[in-house]
Amino acid sequence: NGNRVCPGVKGATNWMSQTFNPATGLLTLIALEQCDVFTSSSKEPEPKKSFSGGGARPTPQDVGQHFVRAFDPKTGKRVWEYPLTGAGEMWAGTVGTKTGVIFFGDDDGHAVAVDGKTGRNLWHYNVGEMLYASPITYAVDGKQYFAIASSTAIWTFGLFEPVKPVAVPKI
């Protein structure tokens, strides 16, 4: 019994970091498609004790699905989405670079980079545990890095170096 509400308590998007790229005009964020059944409680509040008045839980059939999604904030239209894997407990955010690469982590322990215009996977690395933190980028001596924390470590990766074309001699 109760009322099924979509999105649920953890659904849609929340406090996790979002990325806006002025060059593409896209807003990229983590989203959770999940509904909850909200119930009320007849229990009376008591002084100095927490009180919620009820609860909310997903049904066993509504396991939910996380996505990284890019939207055009002017139109509200979804431009692309990248499905995430794992248990659906991930609350990390996204971070973008000037070159249009979007970085994030997922429940299965993958640090991921996608093309910010298309959502195409560019790179991923399995760190072996959930990545709950929002990622950051920073530079040292002109080299840019991407970092994200897991429960036991801070994982740092150097960003891609552009490949320069090489002239091939004629034979």
Question: What residue spans do the PLM features occupy?
Answer:
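Extracytoplasmic/lumenal domain signature
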Residues: 1-4, 34-90, 95-171
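Signature of short aromatic-glycine-proline-rich micro-motifs recurring in repeat-based ectodomains
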Residues: 4-19, 93
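Glycine-rich, aromatic-lined ligand/substrate-binding cores of catalytic
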Residues: 12-45
